[in-house]
A protein has these predicted regions:
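C-terminal "post-core" interaction segments
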Residues: 3-195
C-alpha cells in the first residue's frame, strides 16, 4: 500500500481504507477534544469501505485482503489521513511500514462557516487530536517506519523534507516528556489541552 506523498484527506476515507485490511471491529483511530463529549473511537466496519466513495474503489475487494502480508510505504510527505491508515495497520501488526518518518499531523480541524454581509467564509479551527489504536499521538512526531529506506533522489514525485514539527507555531505533542520552552510556548498559544 503506497502512501508516499499522500497529504491525507477525509477521516472517513482513512477509516474505510484501514477497515479494508483489518479484522471487523478493530480500533482504527480515536479522537480526543477539549471535552469528554467530543471524544470518539472509530472501529473497522465493513460498511465503511463498501459504501460511499470507497465503494467503487474497494467493491472487488476479497476477504484475503484482511490476511495477505502487507507492506505500507510512507515518507515525510505522508500526512494526516494516510498517517491514520499507517498507524492503525502498524499498531495491529497487520503491516510492515517501510520508508521514512511521516509528516506528523495528529490534529483534527473543523471548518466553521462565518457570514459577513452577503459573503460566507470558513475558518479552519483545530478542535481535537487523534491517537492510533495503541494510544500514540503522532502530532509533531510522525509515524516511524519499521524499516527505514531513503526516498530515491530522482523520480516522478520529489518530496519535501518538511514535517509538522518544522512549522512555526505547530501544535506540540503532549506525550513528549521533555518539551523545549519553544514547544511549550507554541502549544500554549495554539490550543491548550488538559490530557
Amino acid at each position: 500500500l503506497d502512501l508516499r506523498n499522500d497529504p491525507g484527506g477525509l477521516l472517513q476515507a482513512a477509516i474505510g481504507v484501514s477497515a479494508a485490511f483489518l479484522p471487523e471491529k478493530s480500533d482504527v483511530v480515536s479522537i480526543k477534544g477539549r471535552t469528554p463529549q467530543s471524544d470518539y473511537a472509530f472501529k473497522a466496519v465493513e460498511k465503511d469501505y463498501r459504501s460511499g466513495n470507497a465503494a467503487k474503489a474497494l467493491a472487488e475487494l476479497t476477504p484475503a485482503a484482511k490476511t495477505v502480508p502487507l507492506v505500507v510505504l510512507i515518507n515525510s510527505s505522508s500526512a494526516s489521513a494516510s498517517e491514520i491508515v499507517a498507524g492503525a495497520l502498524q499498531d495491529h501488526k497487520r503491516a510492515v511500514l517501510l520508508g521514512d518518518r511521516s509528516f506528523g499531523k495528529g490534529s483534527v480541524q473543523t471548518i466553521l462557516p462565518m457570514t459577513f454581509g452577503e459573503k460566507t467564509v470558513g475558518v479552519k479551527l483545530t478542535t481535537a487530536r487523534y491517537y492510533t489504536p495503541s494510544g500514540r499521538s503522532i502530532q509533531a512526531r510522525g509515524i516511524e517506519p519499521d524499516f527505514y529506506v531513503d526516498d530515491t533522489p530522482k523520480g516522478n514525485f520529489p518530496t519535501f523534507q518538511v514535517r509538522e514539527a518544522d512549522l512555526a507555531h505547530h501544535l506540540a505533542n503532549q506525550q513528549d516528556a521533555k518539551k523545549s520552552d519553544k514547544d511549550k510556548k507554541a502549544e500554549a498559544e495554539a490550543l491548550p489541552y488538559d490530557d
